[in-house]
């Protein structure tokens, strides 16, 4: 089956979060299953074509009469990079700079989507599925119906629109409609109008043939007023078309038996290397090397969506136990300062690294005993799956993908982690104390570790589910 996959970021070339991870991995997994997949994304200013090994493509690609240059990264699922010197090439941030969105994001991502829809005719492709991701590509289903209705390259193509985070809705003043080349008729409540603004997210939800999101639990949560970000009524109307498909992880990049970022390697059958990773992590972050003390790790954005307010509130009581905490992350300045202060006040118990370091993120996953993810909401989450693979027991709030990937320990021989429901510091503290108590029971803890490491969270599993959905939309193709 031919699939055109469109995303505003694609790892490893451009990434601000989970969307980049998905766009970098899912098309490759689909290609490995025998599908013909092409990926379309902007050539952001941060991407050096020559350093990235991109090749120019000679093609007659035009968007609203304007010629568009194209680059490609060859591979099983080739990635096409759309060039626009002003809209993308001259920008540092993918969506904004200095904490503010780019003022022309509506024009930027309307351009990307139009370029993606024009690409099949220019390259001789005949995709049966257009897989469009998040608000940046939300205009795609409407544009397919109204601007490409007679395009033979897209005849019969069906659209899949994936919600990676419903909180980001692509909201713009209605006055941008003429600049986008959209008629005023789309500015209706049953189309793209959202509280007197234009919503790219709502456009995708209203016009795509099928909707997906990144975990089954999140798919249920967004149907409710509490989780639906004021789009729950539309989503309930389209509930039969909504599918929750859990994200996967890159099991090659995240493999404790081969990870180049680790000082020692290990697997479920021999955890000696994990003990060595723990000692090395303690040394690296300046904590006393004490193998008997549980290490709790966090690799997170310091924002309330991630539950960091719960961690900050629970930390003093948590430190009453004999435990070490290692945090890596950046975000809200108040939380950066709070954890830096905690590290100064408890230098033998708390280590805080403000910023991001890919290698250290891997070493925390490998060296910690437990991993805290108390998110307020979490569409899917990746770190809990990394933790399971690395034998690090997750303590999570039972929301979104966290609820789908971590089974609560039953006190005997079932479960892969520890879950809590209430969004309170006390609930986090209670779950973490449960984990610390079980840590002292080496046999029970070993069972938790081994069950977690046996979980299959690969992209192969997720790709099979997407492929099944595609075939219901375009059978026999």
Curated annotation (Swiss-Prot):
Question: Which catalytic reaction applies to this protein?
Answer: [(1->4)-alpha-D-glucosyl](n) + ADP-alpha-D-glucose = [(1->4)-alpha-D-glucosyl](n+1) + ADP + H(+)
Q: Which family does it belong to?
A: Belongs to the glycosyltransferase 1 family. Bacterial/plant glycogen synthase subfamily.
Q: What is this protein called?
A: Glycogen synthase
Query: Quick one: a GO biological-process term for this protein?
Result: glycogen biosynthetic process
Q: Residues of the signal sequence?
A: none
Task: Reply yes or no: does the keyword Hydrolase apply.
Answer: no
Source organism per UniProt: Anaeromyxobacter dehalogenans (strain 2CP-1 / ATCC BAA-258)
What exactly does this protein do? Synthesizes alpha-1,4-glucan chains using ADP-glucose.
**GO molecular function term, any single one:** alpha-1,4-glucan glucosyltransferase (UDP-glucose donor) activity
Identify the InterPro entries for this entry.
Glyco_trans_1, GS/SS, Starch_synth_cat_dom
Ordered alphabetically, the record's keywords are: Glycogen biosynthesis, Glycosyltransferase, Transferase
Gene Ontology, cellular component aspect? cytosol
Q: Which residues bind ADP-alpha-D-glucose?
A: 15
Pathway(s) it belongs to: Glycan biosynthesis; glycogen biosynthesis
Q: What is this enzyme's EC?
A: 2.4.1.21
């Amino acid at each position: 089956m031919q699939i055109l996959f469109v995303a505003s970021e694609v790892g490893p070339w451009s990434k601000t979060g989970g969307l980049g991870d998905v766009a970098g991995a899912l098309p490759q997994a689909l290609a490995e299953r025998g599908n013909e997949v092409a990926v379309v994304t902007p050539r952001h200013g941060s991407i050096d074509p020559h350093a990235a090994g991109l090749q120019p493509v000679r093609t007659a690609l035009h968007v609203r009469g304007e010629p568009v240059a194209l680059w490609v990264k060859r591979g099983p699922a080739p990635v096409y990079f759309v060039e626009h010197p002003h809209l993308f090439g001259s920008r540092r941030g993918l969506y904004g700079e200095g904490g503010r969105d780019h003022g022309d994001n509506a024009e930027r991502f309307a351009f990307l989507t139009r370029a993606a829809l024009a690409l099949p005719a220019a390259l001789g492709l005949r995709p049966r599925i257009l897989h469009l991701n998040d608000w940046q590509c939300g205009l795609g289903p409407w544009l397919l119906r109204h601007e490409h209705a007679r395009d033979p390259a897209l005849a019969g193509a069906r659209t899949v629109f994936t919600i990676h985070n419903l909180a980001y809705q692509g909201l713009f003043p209605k006055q941008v409609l003429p600049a986008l080349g959209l008629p005023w008729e789309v500015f209706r409540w049953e189309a793209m109008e959202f509280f007197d603004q234009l919503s790219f997210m709502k456009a995708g939800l209203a016009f795509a043939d099928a909707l997906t999101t990144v975990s089954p639990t999140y798919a249920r949560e967004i149907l409710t007023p509490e989780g639906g970000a004021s789009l729950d009524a539309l989503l309930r109307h389209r509930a039969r078309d909504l599918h929750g498909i859990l994200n996967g992880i890159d099991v090659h990049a995240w493999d404790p038996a081969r990870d180049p970022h680790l000082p020692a390697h290990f697997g479920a059958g021999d955890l000696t290397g994990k003990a060595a990773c723990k000692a090395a992590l303690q040394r690296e972050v300046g904590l006393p090397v004490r193998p008997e003390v549980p290490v709790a790790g966090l690799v997170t954005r310091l924002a309330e969506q991630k539950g960091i307010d719960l961690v900050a509130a629970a930390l003093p009581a948590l430190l009453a136990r004999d435990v070490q905490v290692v945090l890596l992350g950046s975000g809200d300045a108040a939380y950066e300062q709070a954890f830096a202060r905690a590290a100064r006040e408890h230098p033998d118990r708390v280590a805080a690294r403000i910023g991001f370091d890919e290698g250290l993120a891997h070493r925390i996953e490998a060296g910690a005993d437990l991993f805290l993810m108390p998110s307020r909401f979490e569409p899917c989450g990746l770190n809990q799956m990394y933790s399971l693979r690395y034998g690090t027991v997750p303590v999570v709030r039972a929301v979104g993908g966290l609820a789908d990937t971590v089974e609560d320990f039953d006190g005997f021989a079932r479960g892969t982690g520890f879950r809590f429901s209430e969004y309170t510091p006390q609930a986090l503290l209670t779950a973490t104390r449960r984990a610390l108590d079980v840590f002292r029971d080496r046999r029970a803890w070993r069972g938790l570790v081994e069950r977690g490491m046996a979980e299959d969270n690969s992209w192969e599993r997720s790709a099979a589910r997407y492929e099944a959905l595609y075939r219901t939309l375009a059978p026999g193709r």
